[in-house]
């Protein structure tokens, strides 16, 4: 019997990689529902191949989608709109697995809906967990949802931890003999740039990651190291560990995806070629394994693997994220909202590359922190933080 999959963000890089895996295993998985934000022609091609029962697009894209469906004689797929539609498909009774791959804060409500519906949730949307934190983790426990990390680093950590680690007490302290998590970072395309060189970085340059094929937003986050900061916060929540037990290690080759150190002196690492199909397949099938077309790692190709500490003078975003995690409450929501606005402004060439962390720092300083008591207060603070960030960008000429 096949398992039914909902893919939130099907036309993004994670969504496309997920389809690749599902297409290789039609005896195990079927696509029940998908969502897309803007690439409607691509969505139609996906629908022709995988024949989902339901698709969700923004309200303003409904007419375009229905026109293309009519041209292709597609009449057996229901079309829903907006956040309400996303929540509907993520929590649908016919769905077994939800791939949460919508970029940014827009993925929060549907991801939480999937968790509250007790689904197997493959978490590729780190921002949802950065914002909701313990609310999301508590909901997973309350509704017996299985929250499995798809980010290559968190998936590597998950594979390197004791098999029952997620069932351990959530104390903020390492459990079951674990002493530390080593979160690897490629360092991005500007690892060896000077501060002066960073001031001249263009959006086109920032979107070319040396090792991974990714979307624009995560590529820029990777270049500023904010992606690693968001991943640090995500790791703290997923694995119930305080931020001072997480060390970021720059590893330019992206072969070791992360490591876990133990009290007996052991360090376990998960290694593999940099291809998102591997962690996606792992999360889909866990605790089983799926065949993929990803070539096995050939160690003889690599004469050496390099490691270094991150330069937080050149890349202050990492420390901003660590400070936000330490502050707790709504600080990570403020951090994430300001960063999304700053990255968007950079991609539109309204601000320079080095202004991105400045926008984030200003917004964190401007807004008062408070306890993250509910999803409503998180969304309210997200909205305010975006406004403050926009105002600051305008004030510096963006």
Swiss-Prot record:
Mn(2+) binds at residues 151, 153, 231. It holds the Pfam family DXPR_C. GO terms for molecular function: 1-deoxy-D-xylulose-5-phosphate reductoisomerase activity; manganese ion binding; NADPH binding. InterPro entries: DXP_reductoisomerase (IPR003821), DXP_reductoisomerase_C (IPR013644), DXP_reductoisomerase_N (IPR013512), DXPR_C (IPR026877), DXPR_C_sf (IPR036169), NAD(P)-bd_dom_sf (IPR036291). 1-deoxy-D-xylulose 5-phosphate binds at residues 126, 152-153, 186, 209, 222, 227-228, 231. Pathway: Isoprenoid biosynthesis; isopentenyl diphosphate biosynthesis via DXP pathway; isopentenyl diphosphate from 1-deoxy-D-xylulose 5-phosphate: step 1/6. Keywords: Isoprene biosynthesis, Manganese, Metal-binding, NADP, Oxidoreductase. Its cofactor is Mg(2+); Mn(2+). This is 1-deoxy-D-xylulose 5-phosphate reductoisomerase. It comes from Acinetobacter baumannii (strain ATCC 17978 / DSM 105126 / CIP 53.77 / LMG 1025 / NCDC KC755 / 5377). The gene is dxr. The keyword NADP applies. NCBIfam families: Dxr (TIGR00243), PRK05447.1-1 (NF003938), PRK12464.1 (NF009114). HAMAP family: DXP_reductoisom (MF_00183). It catalyses: 2-C-methyl-D-erythritol 4-phosphate + NADP(+) = 1-deoxy-D-xylulose 5-phosphate + NADPH + H(+). The keyword NADP applies. It is an enzyme of class 1 (oxidoreductase).
